[in-house]
Amino acid sequence: MSHRYIPLTEKDKQEMLETIGANSIEELFGDVPKEILLDRELDIPNGEDETTLLKRLSRIAKKNITKEDYTSFLGAGVYDHYTPAVVDAMISRSEFYTAYTPYQPEISQGELQAIFEFQTLICELTGMDVANSSMYDGITAFAEACILAFSQTKKNKIVVSKGLHYQALQVLHTYSKIRNDYEIVEVDLDGTVTDLEKLEDAIDDETAAVAVQYPNFYGSIEDLEKIKSLIKNKKTLFIVYTNPLSLGLLTPPGDFGADIVVGDTQPFGIPAQFGGPHCGFFATTKKLMRKVPGRLVGQTEDDHGNRGFVLTLQAREQHIRRDKATSNICSNQALNALASSIAMSALGKQGLQDIAVQNFENANYAKNQFKDAGIEVLPGTSFNEFVIKLDKPVKEVNDKLLEEGIIGGFDLSEVNEEFGQAMLIAVTELRTKDEIDTFVKKVGEING
């Protein structure tokens, strides 16, 4: 019987050697120079039985600080949200348990339909015409949107708000290096929102796109209507990076005339874990449909008139025309897209709206509590994040909060020195009034 982790027994090895006419492993690799062969056993521990191994791994895992054991007010792009129990139950089914888009639609109708439903839900949330089957994460989806703008408009300049997630800006600058003539212009903030006067000055006839985040990285809700009005040249695209949960409460970017809407569905059924995996989405207009990166699932009919699903418009993709492909995306996040689809479906339209309202109300309750405690809260209309100013270094405050069982907010001094000692705080539907009150009290005591 084979070992459960090592498929070859000594008997198996001997039979294989006899089949190929070798007497030993050493003879099999006889052509490898002896001077590069290791002549001793590897300096690693011996194997352990399953019980001992599980105990060891459990001890290691307990060293981690998790949101299950602590109260978290950390966001900055990854949030502590409720995940319906049905999500894990459904995505664990063997027929769904893959991250790949199926290339054989005739035998993958269930998976393709699930992706089609994901695309439909994203379109309904964003107010756009078309959405792709998913991307690696929201930040790479944003960078791909900017590359599309360069390609579509034949212009080489993109104007972006500094209110975008700092990692989105970093990735965009990396992507822009594929061409020496791509220009990225970053527009300063006025407080915690984009400075509209500076934005207007930065936009000209050579601008391929204007990009903002809604709500932005600092938690404030940008005025998309005014920003759209500044884009006078119809050939300049309007790109919006958004939190999809916020669209349960906020007006969809599509209603303001956005050309491309991107984001990350992590708030819907995807745990906050290390660096991912996440699930980016990319939604746009029919006009730009043939420029969309990644996979698109379309609905069709078979010869008998039955509804079916296929990968459509594949001529955009690198496995069809590598030299003319719209991107180098070769896979996606099908499993996480399914998780998000199930979460959205389980919540329903009303449930999604209710959770969005809870985020808004909890965050604004926390803001008022901080103000009452004499702690400065930076102005701006918030969805579920906001910024406070502290007298002490944020790292010092967070370290002491951790001792109290609280994961504090994001230290903005690490990414934007202009804010000084400022903490970005996220308050989701999972935070109770008592937890918020305790957090505010502890921050006040530590800050002195």
UniProtKB/Swiss-Prot annotation:
UniProt function note: The glycine cleavage system catalyzes the degradation of glycine. The P protein binds the alpha-amino group of glycine through its pyridoxal phosphate cofactor; CO(2) is released and the remaining methylamine moiety is then transferred to the lipoamide cofactor of the H protein.
Protein name: Probable glycine dehydrogenase (decarboxylating) subunit 1
Gene3D superfamilies referenced in this protein's UniProt entry, alphabetically: Aspartate Aminotransferase, domain 1, Type I PLP-dependent aspartate aminotransferase-like (Major domain)
Keyword Kinase: no
Subunit structure of this chain's protein: The glycine cleavage system is composed of four proteins: P, T, L and H. In this organism, the P 'protein' is a heterodimer of two subunits.
SUPFAM superfamilies linked: PLP-dependent transferases (SSF53383)
Keywords per UniProt: Oxidoreductase
Entry-linked Pfam families: GDC-P
Gene: gcvPA
